[in-house]
């Protein structure tokens, strides 16, 4: 059995959460010529749960190929993807502050879902879990939205906000997994790791 795993994610939050589980990990980041963002394209009429699970599998496929291509020591690879959904509408990462403003206006004064899929796999075995949480935003003023969008924090975040950042001031209620909303659900990830023989 391997003594460590690879984390195929550029998210510092996921790395921090994984470290809390006590499992040693090494980053397995995309090569410069890999278009990682292209994997996140939404298919027509794709449901949010199907989308986030498909993208996570694509990320795992790409990471396992990367591992083989680089000739690195074999070990399980962990991938994760988070998306925000209002009904069937998927909110990915905003392209700029104006896009973040548009997303936040739509999410203001609503309860939306945050779906995080996690996959752990090797060339011979793979497992996947899905964690769904709900977040309720209060009614945000235009000034609050514009100030937050201009802060830069929404960039690179699904739904244009970070639950562990300034956006917490707008969240009136949440249910489910706080770590899942951050990007790596601890309970479900621990279950995956245990299924691969890791002691968590």
Curated annotation (Swiss-Prot):
Its cofactor is a divalent metal cation. Its main location: cytoplasm. The record marks 13, 82, 164 as: Important for substrate specificity. It comes from the Bacteria. Keywords: Cytoplasm, Hydrolase, Nucleotide metabolism. GO terms for biological process: nucleotide metabolic process; potassium ion transport. It catalyses: dTTP + H2O = dTMP + diphosphate + H(+); UTP + H2O = UMP + diphosphate + H(+). Pfam families: Maf. The active site is at residue 81. Its EC number is 3.6.1.9. GO terms for molecular function: dTTP diphosphatase activity; monoatomic cation transmembrane transporter activity; UTP diphosphatase activity. It is found in: Cytoplasm. One of its GO terms (cellular component) is cytoplasm. InterPro entries: ITPase-like_fam, Maf-like, RCK_C. The keyword Hydrolase applies. Transmembrane segments: none annotated. Nucleoside triphosphate pyrophosphatase that hydrolyzes dTTP and UTP. May have a dual role in cell division arrest and in preventing the incorporation of modified nucleotides into cellular nucleic acids. HAMAP family: Maf. Belongs to the Maf family. YhdE subfamily. This is dTTP/UTP pyrophosphatase. It comes from Albidiferax ferrireducens (strain ATCC BAA-621 / DSM 15236 / T118).
């Amino acid at each position: 059995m391997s003594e460590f795993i690879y984390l195929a994610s550029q998210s510092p939050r996921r790395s921090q959460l994984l470290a809390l589980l006590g499992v040693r990990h090494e980053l397995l980041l995309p090569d410069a010529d890999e278009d990682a963002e292209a994997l996140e394209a939404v298919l027509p009429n794709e449901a949010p749960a199907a989308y986030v699970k498909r993208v996570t599998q694509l990320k795992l496929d790409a990471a396992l190929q990367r591992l083989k291509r680089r000739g690195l020591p074999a070990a399980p690879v962990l991938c994760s993807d988070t998306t925000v959904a209002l009904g069937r509408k998927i909110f990915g990462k905003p392209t700029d502050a104006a896009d973040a403003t548009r997303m936040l206006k739509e999410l203001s004064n609503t309860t939306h879902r945050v779906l995080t899929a996690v996959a752990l796999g090797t060339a011979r075995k793979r497992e996947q879990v899905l964690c769904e949480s709900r977040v309720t935003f209060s009614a945000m003023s235009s000034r609050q939205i514009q100030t937050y969008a201009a802060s830069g924090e929404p960039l690179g975040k699904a739904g244009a906000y970070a639950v562990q950042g300034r956006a917490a001031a707008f969240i009136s209620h949440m249910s489910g997994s706080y770590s899942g909303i951050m990007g790596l659900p601890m309970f479900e990830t621990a279950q995956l790791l245990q299924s691969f023989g890791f002691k968590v």
